[in-house]
Amino acid sequence: MFTLFQGKWQVSVKAGLAALICSLSTVSLQAAERVGDFALLDQDGFFHHMGWYDDHKAIAFLVQVNGSPQTAEAVASYAALQSRFDAQGIEFMMINPLGQSRASVKQAAMDLDVEVPVLIDDAQVISKAMGIDKSGEAFLYDPRSFEVIFRGPVAALETALNEVAAGKSVSTPVVAMSGADVSYQMNTSISYVNDVAPILAENCATCHRDGGIAPFALDSHAMVQGWSPMIREVLMTKRMPPGQIDPHVGNFTNDYVLSVEEQQTLIGWIESGSLKDGESDPLASLTWPSTKWAYGEPDLIVKVPPQEIPATGVLDYITVMVPFAGLDRDRWVRASQYIAGDRTVLHHTLNAVIAPGTRPSAASFLGGGDPNAAFITPYIPGAEPHLEKPNTGGLLKAGSMLGLQLHYTTTGKATTDASEIGVWFYPDDQVPAERRSGQCACIFPDSWTNIPPYDPNFEQTQSITIQRDAHLLSFIPHMHFRGKNMRFAAHYPDGSVEQLINIANYNYNWQLDYQLAEPKLVPAGTKIVVTAAFDNSTQNKANPDAAREVPWGQQSWDEMFFGQVYWKYVDQNTLVSSTAQ
């Protein structure tokens, strides 16, 4: 049974043919309706945020459906319009409203000889908001007002494009057309208690609570309802949950991507009025641990020397050496957690465990070095405490020091950062049998290429080679304000290539350690190739200075390229035996 859901009402075929015709007319003849800002990934996994295109006069969309005759018939005319209007401030794309598989959409685009991005609406919430209901239809979207300003057949699009290019309003914003219907799966009865609150509790409330790192709490229906317009916006633009990666590449325990069903539930509930059902409020009854430590009271707490941070100015990186006070014997480390004293000024740290009689090395600060040595987690925005895999750990020798490189930013208010690091050990009689290894695919000043001024998509590449059979565990990207995206790919000895992770919308504020759900076996000689793009354009709202040629540098207005990879060697005997010597 076909159903159509729009706003707070639903029409069914069973309700009468006349009502259905009326409803379809309402949808088809609406334009200049505010959709809102949004972002989607295309058939190649690239991220497109509509707000980024606000220097354009409009964005043109052609509704693409695999195997649709209407799409195929419209492509040639659409491409001809692109060749004419692309230089006049019109961006051309397609949109797949059915959320069809990326591989099939990519193949369909190749078959049609399409060279424009095809945005894939997995959850169908964007297409629904735009009012898309027919394949092969053309739309014009204003990236400043976030409105649909034209919809109709491609044959009628030319007139609208001429008007928009000339700075005029579209005289005929809606032109009726026929075509294959686009249908949507709708949840007609969404419960706050049973459907919405559990999603928020699982994905949002840990940060959005009293004392959490988020700026407001989502601890009741009233709070959620009050913030619901903002929640809809950040879901549609993929700003939240933070740190999202491409869900179509790899399988990660912390990809921070809501499922299609979860997105549909939240946005559908908000668009239905954010109503509450039942007497209870699950969010109001959530409880949180009384301790700030993730795994109970640590076995050892390292006090980082307090740092006085002025209100303004540029601060050099601060390097300190901190003893593991109270460590009276060698211990195997199971977990660690860095708690910032003032997270408004501490941006990140680099850590290195320095054993007695040794000197710190660059590799040890960059996640490499001796795999037998203990790993003490650094502070990274949004990062979780580090817990080793079962039966895995490194040795922290008595008398060791912790080298810390601290990066602070000023906020206009003087403050003191007094951070703490919690460390948890294995029992003395339990020696973990496996070690974690790692290496950074990094670009340093000697091989860095300066980013040209105003370049919106400047790419650089670095690689590392894993010399023995190994199981990949996790990946960490690091760039600065101009970082746009970063991709890790495995180039195998047999010549095949596999994408491992796609951080499609890199955000300097969220640099996470993305953990594979299952370790991935790669053979000896596998090359991990990391490709990163930088956006040095004026459209990058975080860009300090688009006119500048950007060098490598430690400060945020310069740039870096770190692609950290962690793995375990399949043969652990050499590593373990070297520890025993």
Regions found by a protein language model. Give the residues of each.
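Beta-strand-centric surfaces of beta-sandwich/beta-rich domains
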Residues: 242, 247-252, 282-332, 337-471, ...
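A short beta-strand-turn-helix
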Residues: 38-59, 189-195
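Short active-site neighborhood of thiol/selenol oxidoreductases, capturing the structured segment around
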Residues: 53-72
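Bacterial N-terminal signal peptides
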Residues: 14-26
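Thiol/selenol-based redox catalytic cores and closely related redox-interacting motifs
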Residues: 121-183
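Structural micro-motif
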Residues: 36, 58, 114-117, 132-139, ...
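Aromatic- and Gly/Pro-enriched helix-to-coil junctions and flexible linker segments
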Residues: 174-327, 331, 339, 348, ...
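Structural microenvironment flanking redox-active thiols in thiol-disulfide oxidoreductases
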Residues: 70-112, 119-129
